[in-house]
Curated annotation (Swiss-Prot):
This is Serine--tRNA ligase. It comes from Lactobacillus delbrueckii subsp. bulgaricus (strain ATCC 11842 / DSM 20081 / BCRC 10696 / JCM 1002 / NBRC 13953 / NCIMB 11778 / NCTC 12712 / WDCM 00102 / Lb 14). GO terms for molecular function: ATP binding; catalytic activity, acting on a protein; serine-tRNA ligase activity; transferase activity. The gene is serS. The lineage of its organism: Bacteria, Bacillati, Bacillota, Bacilli, Lactobacillales. Its main location: cytoplasm. GO terms for biological process: selenocysteine biosynthetic process; seryl-tRNA aminoacylation.
Length: 435
């Protein structure tokens, strides 16, 4: 959530910044007008409360002296009614103000490419050349089916479209990938955490998914009354429980930065993505992802964004997967992010790069929503900054391995970094079919 004081005192700047993220200036004018009314009502209310306190002392003194205080008492009853009305007005204006603030995205960093969509993203660097083949490479969904290690048909029968079964070497590969990620992340100083997969609305609001993106997730509904939600949502990413672990806390500044990592299932409704990536592992309703989260001091967050991105790149490099780093435009960056680097892995069958990780600096945006603070060396309490990044999306990594390490005979070579996690297996060959 943005700081209303920053908007109030820098309105033209705020309008210019948020215009690059699709926010109309009229929204900020409305917000500032509501804020002005709220502050005016607060001042009136505080003045009346101060007056009531002073008069109450005089009434008490008059009673001690057995003097008539009936007129003052009657006046104070009227003042009490006005105070109650003003308190209610302040609450209503505060609610309206918060309604708007909760739906405004983070201010973009000055270094962000300016543009309304992904076509304005800027490539920062590449690692390794795209994998070349002397033959037409197969798509990972064809490889997975031919090797009998991925089964979308069975998953569609049991669940719905955009679900998959991993079998045999496919299941072993998936497990190898996320164990490799966790081992590498912890070796880089991250503490591994196992999180809940269901979170409450306060948590979803704290990290910025609610109230703006309620259609993108799955919420648990009471079976006895389908209209009544249980206030629990299946997590779209481990970022939600990892960041909200610190919600409402005041952290000792000596303990910052805090680096945590977690493997979790991720559940996405994929609302609005009909017809896109209908085949394969790229866009699923349920998948596994290893997440990295940093809670840091504000002065360290830009350095930590580079560290976070390096941590994600390190995983792709150890797997030998070609990728590029892209700085997202103001119109393509996530709602909570001030700056995002996407890591895009090369997918030979599609002849293009596809996102496999997003590394974002959310500055104090999530910390303000979730009230994550720290106490500095002078004892002053301040908001932290939070960062998050995929380290990495597991299914997409499996897809990239299948496509980049495929052989002409239809087998897939296992990357050297994963062989210790796959019982020494060097090549994935077709699994026996059950039917």
């Amino acid at each position: 959530m943005l700081d209303i004081k920053v908007i109030r005192e820098n309105l033209d700047w705020a309008k210019e910044k948020l215009a690059t993220r699709g926010i109309k200036p009229e929204q900020l004018d409305e917000l500032v007008a509501i804020d002005a009314k709220r502050r005016e009502a607060m001042v009136k209310c505080e003045n009346l409360k101060a007056e009531r306190n002073e008069v109450s002392k005089k009434i008490a003194a008059a009673k001690r002296e057995k003097a008539d205080a009936s007129e003052a008492i009657a006046n104070m009853r009227e003042v009490g009614v006005k105070i109650k009305e003003l308190d209610q007005e302040v609450d209503e204006l505060q609610e309206k103000q918060e309604y708007i603030l909760l739906r405004l995205p983070n201010f973009p960093a000055d270094s962000d490419p300016i543009g309304p969509d992904e076509s304005y993203n800027e490539e920062v660097r590449r690692w390794n050349e795209p994998t070349k083949f002397d033959y037409q490479p197969k798509a990972h969904w064809d490889l997975g089916t031919d090797l009998n290690i991925l089964d979308w048909d069975a998953a569609s029968k049991v669940s719905a479209a955009r679900f998959v079964y991993y079998k045999g070497a496919g299941a072993l590969l998936e497990r190898a990938v996320y164990n490799f990620f966790l081992d590498e992340n912890t070796s880089e100083g991250y503490t591994e955490v196992i999180t809940p997969s269901l979170v409450n609305n306060d948590s979803m609001q704290g990290t910025g998914q609610f109230p703006k993106f309620t259609e993108d997730v799955y919420t648990i509904v009471d079976n006895d009354d389908p209209e009544v939600a249980r206030n629990l949502t299946l997590i779209p990413t481990a970022e939600v429980p990892l960041v909200n672990y610190f919600r409402g806390d005041i952290i000792d500044g000596k303990n910052l930065p805090i680096n945590v990592t977690a493997l979790s299932p991720a559940f996405r409704s994929e609302a609005g993505s009909a017809g896109r990536d209908t085949r394969g592992l790229i866009r699923m309703h349920e998948f596994r992802k290893v997440e990295m989260v940093k809670v840091v001091k504000p002065e360290d967050s830009w350095k930590e964004l580079e560290n976070l991105t390096h941590n994600a790149e390190h995983l792709l490099q150890k797997l030998g997967l070609p990728y590029r780093v892209v700085a997202l435009s103001t119109g393509d960056a996530s709602f909570t992010s001030a700056k995002t680097y996407d890591l895009e892995v090369w997918m030979p069958a599609q002849d293009t790069y596809r996102e496999i990780s997003s590394c974002s600096n959310c500055t104090d945006f999530q910390a303000r929503r979730a009230q994550i603070r720290y106490r500095d060396e002078d004892g002053k309490v301040k908001l932290t900054h939070t960062l998050n990044g995929s380290g990495l999306a597991v299914g997409r990594t499996v897809a990239a391995i299948l496509e980049n390490y495929q052989n002409e005979d239809g087998t897939v070579t296992v990357p050297e970094a994963l062989r210790p996690y796959m019982h020494g297996m060097t090549k994935i060959t077709p699994e026996v079919k059950w039917h």
